[in-house]
Structures are given as C-alpha cells and as structure tokens.
C-alpha cells in the first residue's frame, strides 16, 4: 500500500530586498512524497531548491500553500497549525537533516556525535550509544566509532551525518547537496546508501543536488527552474516496493 508521507500543495515564497524590490523564490510548488521513496530535485543555483527544503522542513514559513505531513496538517490558512515549541518538537522527532557541510562537533567522536540527539531527548546515554553504534556499524563504520571527525575521510564524515539524521527514526530526511564536497566514488556510495535506507527503513528522502547522474538514482526526479517545480524523470526501479 502506498502511504503519502508528505503532501505540499501550491507553496509560494518571496523575499523583499532593500529598496522594496520583491523576488519570487517559489511559485505554486506542489510535491507529494510517499513512505520509503527517494526523491531528488535538480536545478541551477538560485532556482529555489534550498528554499523549498527549508519550507518542507518547517525551517521557514511559506507565503501561501499547504503542508500535510503523514496526514497531519502542518501549514494551512497562511500559518502553522502548531505552536513554535510544538513545531520544533515535531521537527526533531519526524524529520532528519543532512547538509553539504556535515557540521559534526570537532571535539566529539563519531559515536558521540550520533548519540547526542537521543541522549538530549531521553537522558539515557547508554541506550543512545547502543543505538548510535548500531547505525554506524550498518554504515560500515564499526572501526571508526571512537574517531574524531578530523580523523575521518569526507565520505565517512557524511555517513556519520546521515546516521545522526536517522538517530530519532525520522519519517523524512531532507538532504541539501549531501555529496557536494565528495569525489565521484564517495558520492556514488553515498547515494547508494541513501537509496538502501529508504527501502529498508521505509524512510522518505528528498535530496537536492546539481548532479543529474546521481539524481537519476532516485525513484523520482524533479527539476526546479525559476521557482517552478516539474517532474524531470519518472520510472520504476526493480528494487521498488
């Protein structure tokens, strides 16, 4: 059964610059993503990709449109349906974030970086470390648990960042140019890892990238241009559920 995880309808966003000139960043963007689906969004710099991720992740506020997450309305009638505190709690439980720059804490080991979110939420350090170790081992980092970020390769650092994003078992992961600083081999491995996670854990991924080759590894690919979103390529994989 296909379960819709995220349903965003007619999202628009504009900014007013100095001199009161208004720039329309997003214009009536509609996107529906299903459970366990990997979706990529390609487009030139400044096309609105990152702004869209920020709206979908409730990090910014749309001018108009609706956002429904797992059948729960989050944004409608030009406002969020939850208080700021409740929205932050919802975001921390349901959404994971991966960025081009991993933002790992330099004085903490890979294990500690991943375990921290759950430890802060539950206060149970031992359980958090067990869960973090399981994730990192699943990502091929069992021998890197006690290494600092500076002791890891770029590909390993991004795998740690993805493990951290998955620590709270989110329903959706938003990734903004996650392979931007990686070489071709590590980029390929990273996308293969995200594709595997999406199917094994039924976690939806929305990935912004400028690389069309990696984008084609997704279940669906969209193209963003001048604030408008259109489907670039749609096909079924033999591995799709």
Swiss-Prot record:
Record family assignment: Belongs to the ABC transporter superfamily. Lipoprotein translocase (TC 3.A.1.125) family.
Residue ranges of every copy of the ABC transporter domain listed in the record: 6-241
Lineage: Bacteria, Pseudomonadati, Chlorobiota, Chlorobiia, Chlorobiales
Positions contributing to ATP binding: 43-50
Listed name of the protein: Lipoprotein-releasing system ATP-binding protein LolD 2
Entry keywords, A to Z: ATP-binding, Cell inner membrane, Cell membrane, Membrane, Nucleotide-binding, Translocase, Transport
Membrane topology: Peripheral membrane protein
Task performed by this protein: Part of the ABC transporter complex LolCDE involved in the translocation of mature outer membrane-directed lipoproteins, from the inner membrane to the periplasmic chaperone, LolA. Responsible for the formation of the LolA-lipoprotein complex in an ATP-dependent manner.
A molecular-function term among this protein's GO annotations: transmembrane transporter activity
Binding partners and assembly: The complex is composed of two ATP-binding proteins (LolD) and two transmembrane proteins (LolC and LolE).
The UniProt record lists the keyword Membrane: yes
InterPro entries, alphabetized: AAA+_ATPase (IPR003593), ABC_transporter-like_ATP-bd (IPR003439), ABC_transporter-like_CS (IPR017871), ABC_transpr_LolD-like (IPR015854), MacB-like_ATP-bd (IPR017911), P-loop_NTPase (IPR027417)
Keyword Transmembrane helix: no
GO cellular component terms given for this protein: plasma membrane
Entry EC no(s): 7.6.2.-
Subcellular location per the Swiss-Prot or TrEMBL entry: Cell inner membrane
């Amino acid at each position: 059964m296909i379960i819709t995880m995220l349903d965003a309808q007619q999202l628009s966003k504009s900014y007013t610059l100095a001199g009161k000139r208004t720039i329309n960043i997003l214009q009536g963007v509609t996107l529906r993503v299903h459970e366990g689906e990997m979706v990529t969004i390609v487009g030139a710099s400044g096309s609105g990709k990152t702004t869209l991720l920020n709206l979908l992740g409730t990090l910014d506020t749309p001018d108009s449109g609706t956002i429904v997450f797992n059948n729960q309305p989050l944004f409608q009638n030009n406002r969020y349906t939850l208080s700021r505190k409740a929205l932050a709690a919802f975001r921390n439980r349901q959404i994971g974030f991966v960025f081009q720059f991993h933002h790992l804490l330099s004085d903490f080991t890979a294990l500690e970086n991943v375990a921290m979110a759950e430890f802060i939420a539950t206060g149970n350090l031992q359980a958090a470390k067990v869960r973090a170790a399981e994730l990192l081992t699943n990502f091929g980092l069992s021998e890197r648990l006690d290494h600092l970020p500076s002791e890891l390769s770029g590909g390993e650092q991004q795998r740690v960042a993805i493990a951290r994003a998955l620590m709270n078992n989110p329903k959706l992961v938003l990734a903004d140019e996650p392979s931007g600083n990686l070489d071709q081999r590590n980029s390929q491995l990273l996308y293969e890892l995200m594709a595997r996670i999406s199917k094994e854990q039924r976690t939806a991924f929305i990935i912004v990238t400028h690389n069309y080759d990696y984008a084609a590894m997704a279940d669906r690919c969209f193209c963003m241009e001048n604030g408008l979103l259109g489907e670039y390529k749609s096909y079924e994989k033999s591995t799709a559920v």
